[in-house]
Amino acid sequence: MQFAGWHRCKDADWLTRYDVYDMLCDVDTTAFQHRDKHWSLSIFCLCFFLCKNQKKERIMQIIKDYVYNFSKNSKPVATAEPGEILQFETLDCFSNRLKTEKNLITELAYSYDVANPATGPVYINGAEPGDVLVVDILDVKVADEGTITTDGVCGPLFDHSEVRTKKIKIDNGFADFNGVKFPIDPMIGVIGTAPDGEDVIDGYPGNHGGNMDSKLIKKGARVYFPVRVDGALLQMGDVHATMGDAELCGTGIEIPAVIQVKVSLIKNFELNWPVTETADRWYVNACAHNFDEALKNASLELQRLIMNATGWDETDTYMYMSVQSDVEINQACVPCEVAMILRFGTPKLPQFKPLIG
């Protein structure tokens, strides 16, 4: 006899008492119509045995506390083991302060010092400088209403728009903008680890991650971060129900969310910028205050990673990147004090080892 919860026994590193309950609920009771009543007890004993012989029982940690900067001096709000699944509950980038369309961002004394609250940080046991923190995005669930704003100073059309707040209803996976409905595609705007130097506010990106605003950092993606301090200090927030590349006016559909991730480590692997892995591509995320410098940062890192994986020299790798790799803009809402962020993507090469790992 088979029951739906079996995959949780086979694949999980650990089980909780809730998994046992779920598995028992999954049993097709019609299978017992012509069997001895002791079958039920047998199933329960089997589940108990499986749990007992798994690793130490852990219940998913739920992280709610947040900070406004990435800092090696931040006190961890939780500690996690590699392989553990964590849940982060996040505010929107305005700390949920824009309650109605009558509330304008210009009335908040808004600045990047108090923008983009990131839930965490979480100390990852065993993470040391020189390692890579691997974050698998398992799920991103958003609230039923989000916010778009213009502030009169940000983006290429700031002088062709007025300051405005627009509330966007989310219903059954669709956003409603003035009666135009389109599917949401939730993504995480701010995610990263602590830098080993000066603090970086959550609204800024850097080689630690931060406000990368990549619409590819969503459910199903795997993101790799350099570890520069003990414990890595992972934090995340600034979820968008949907956002276009470049985030033209400075916001996507900003929205509170619940994120589930799995964390793991790669020991002693050089990584200089965060990398996103999708089903078929690798993307280096890099930034600078102008396009040329951001492109150079991303190009150098992607070239290095491809060379390590293939054994090609610099020139062959440069040529290959020119014909098979694409530059895409994460955020470019200039003029804006936030640096330009881009991603440089290349297809996975089944003939060679992965770029990371």
Can you name each region flagged by the protein language model?
Residues 9, 25, 45-47, 51:
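Cysteine-centered motifs
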Residues 269-320:
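A hydrophobic, small-residue-rich beta->alpha segment in the mid-to-C-terminal subdomain
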Residues 60-110:
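N-terminal, Lys/Arg-enriched amphipathic/low-complexity engagement segments
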Residues 139-219, 224:
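Intrinsically disordered, low-complexity linker/loop segments enriched in Gly/Pro
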Residues 62-71, 112-119, 200-208:
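Short, structured beta-strand/loop micro-motifs enriched in basic residues and often containing a Trp
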Residues 93-103, 140-150, 231-241, 330-332:
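Short, Lys/Arg- and Gly-enriched loop/turn segments at beta-strand edges
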